Structure formats: C-alpha cells, structure tokens
From Swiss-Prot:
Keyword Ribosomal protein: yes
Organism: Aster yellows witches'-broom phytoplasma (strain AYWB)
InterPro entries: Ribosomal_bL17 (IPR000456), Ribosomal_bL17_CS (IPR047859), Ribosomal_bL17_sf (IPR036373)
Name of protein: Large ribosomal subunit protein bL17
Subunit and partners: Part of the 50S ribosomal subunit. Contacts protein L32.
Gene3D superfamilies in UniProt: Ribosomal protein L17
Coiled-coil ranges (or none): none
Family (UniProt): Belongs to the bacterial ribosomal protein bL17 family.
UniProt KW keywords: Ribonucleoprotein, Ribosomal protein
Organism lineage string: Bacteria, Bacillati, Mycoplasmatota, Mollicutes, Acholeplasmatales
Amino acid sequence: MPFSKLGRNKSQRRALLRTLMTDLIVQEKIMTTESKAKELQKLADKMVTLSKKNTLHTRRQAKRHLFDEKINDDTTVLQKLFKNISSKYLDRQGGYTRVIKTVPRRGDSAPMAIIAFV
C-alpha cells in the first residue's frame, strides 16, 4: 500500500494532512503520532520540491494541499513556503524534513514523533 489510511476515509485523511501541513509550515516543527508524521513527511518533501520551482502552476498545486491563511499581517502560509522555506533548500535534492521518535503519549501510550524541517 503506497500510503497509510490513518483510520480515516479519504476526505478526513486529506483534511487532516492539510491541517498538519499548514501547521508544519507555520511552526516549522510539530509533535504528532508517529504514523501521521511519516505520512506528513512524504507530503512535506513534495511541497518543498514544488516550491523550489516557483511558477504559477506550482503555487496552485501547493495551494491544494494547504490552508492559505494569514500568519501575520503581511505573510500567508503559501508565501512563507515559497519565499522562506524553499530558499533554505535550493542546493538540497531531498530529505527536507526529519522525524524524531519521542516518548509515548501519556493517556493511551500512542507512539509520538516530532517532525521538523532540517
């Protein structure tokens, strides 16, 4: 199977990954379950690769996977991805994110991980 279903149907899974991707770009590091982090890592690497091309078409493709909300008064999530994050990785060919396993969650002992940009 090329992807994990994360215990959700297609629309719920897409909304979850969209929210996690938006949060990752805004905060540049988030803590989530290990399986969600691994799925998000695939999407995040594709998004950074898209942002390095920086054309109208790639902006529209990236907008499909993000909530383009304002971070502060003059910056949106899409602008941060295409200006700040992509400029860090111009010479890098892949592996833009890393997943670090942490201690299990206290309530249900779910395996947790931190996903962050390298």
